[in-house]
UniProtKB/Swiss-Prot annotation:
Subunit details: The complex is composed of two ATP-binding proteins (MetN), two transmembrane proteins (MetI) and a solute-binding protein (MetQ).
Domain of life: Bacteria
Family listed: Belongs to the ABC transporter superfamily. Methionine importer (TC 3.A.1.24) family.
Any single Pfam family the record assigns to this protein: NIL
Protein name: Methionine import ATP-binding protein MetN
Keyword Manganese tagged: no
Length: 356
């Protein structure tokens, strides 16, 4: 099913944006965002991840024009949102859909009527409203729930109504504010699959904010990591997962991959080498290397035993990525040679310490 598409250019461009909130009652001013530059290409899915207080909510409020930046420009669908007066901004928002963490449905309206609300506000005739709402109910899998009230729907069904409502005005851009945070893991997966299908079917540009790296891994083409009002890392989802550079990014990535050392190993890990200790290495395999027998080749080449302590291989953005934590004999020359051979094969290697 395909909804009518706007001919306006799609995508989001955030240029040198800062947002500072003034001091209140003796407290210092708050710098929520500082020199933010971010491009969301047409038809892409971009995730912005950050901890609480990183500036995510401020960013999304600037994109939909709910707040003005202290400096910089926000361009959505070819229109500079930050330069519009209120009537023009209301019109521009029709091309921007929004879904929320807590659904924001009207309890006195049925699923059909909640989806119809933005069309009613826009003055669309009732006959035309039905032509839009019924296909949307079908798209989100709620054709049989059109007359149900929010209290009669599950959390996942409420979010599906919210998604359909966001699509009612045929937007070119969809903003998602922690849309899966209130859902259980199974329902989260279903909503993410729905968003991916909508992105593909409608060529919809999606920007979502989240604090969950698993959501980024499942949904995003690209990711930007926000920390204390700054974008500290940005890139394709695969590259950010495979080779995180910033410490905040590394913590996010380790929470959903096998790159984090298990607690039992951390409890035994030592910084200094003892006489009977082995060196502990963390090895990341990218792309086709994730399926290659590199460790067995190295074990034969150097005549050593390699003990696998932890790890996994998974798919990220359609590409295999593997992480293994291993121990090998701790002679410095040997550790260096093994590390160099792994790096020459395209793997990333980190020496974590020593273990008895």
């Amino acid at each position: 099913m395909e909804l009518p598409a706007s001919t306006a250019p799609s995508g989001i461009s955030i240029e040198n944006v800062a947002k500072t909130y003034p001091a209140r009652k003796g407290s210092a001013e708050v710098v929520a965002l500082d020199n933010i530059n971010l491009n969301v290409p047409e038809g892409s899915i971009v995730g912005v991840i950050g901890r609480s207080g990183a500036g995510k909510s401020s960013l999304i409020r600037l994109i939909n024009g709910l707040e003005q930046p202290t400096k910089g420009r926000v361009i959505v669908n070819g229109t500079e949102i930050t330069s519009l007066d209120e009537p023009a901004l209301r019109q521009a928002r029709r091309s921007i859909g929004m879904i929320f963490q807590h659904f924001n449905l009207l309890s006195s309206r049925t699923a059909f009527d909640n989806i119809a609300l933005p069309l009613e506000i826009a003055g669309v005739a009732k006959r035309e409203i039905a032509k839009t709402v019924l296909p949307l109910l079908d798209m989100v899998g709620l054709a049989d729930k059109r007359d149900r009230y929010p209290a009669e729907l599950s959390g996942g069904q409420k979010q599906r109504v919210g998604i359909a409502r966001a699509l009612a005005t045929s937007p070119k851009v969809l903003l998602s504010d922690e849309a899966t945070s209130a859902l259980d893991p199974e329902t989260t997966d279903q909503i993410l699959e729905l968003l991916k299908r909508i992105n593909a079917d409608l060529r919809l540009t999606i920007l979502f904010i989240t604090h969950e790296m698993a959501v980024v891994k499942a949904l995003a083409d690209r990711v930007a990591v926000l920390e204390r009002g700054h974008i500290v890392e940005e890139g394709t989802t695969y590259n950010v997962f495979a080779s995180p550079q910033h410490e905040v990014t590394k913590r996010f990535v380790s929470s959903v991959t096998g790159s984090q050392a298990p607690d039992w190993l951390l409890a035994r890990l030592k910084a200094e080498r003892g006489p009977q200790d082995e060196a502990v290495l963390r090895i990341s395999f990218r792309g086709s290397d994730a399926g290659q027998p590199l460790l067995s080749q190295i074990a034969r080449s150097f005549g050593i035993d390699i003990n696998i302590l932890n790890g996994q291989v998974e798919m990220i953005a359609g590409h295999p990525f593997g992480t293994l934590i291993v121990s090998i004999p701790a002679e410095p020359e040997l550790v260096g040679q093994v590390s160099n051979q792994l790096k020459a094969a395209g793997s990333a290697v980190e020496h974590l310490g020593y273990v008895a």
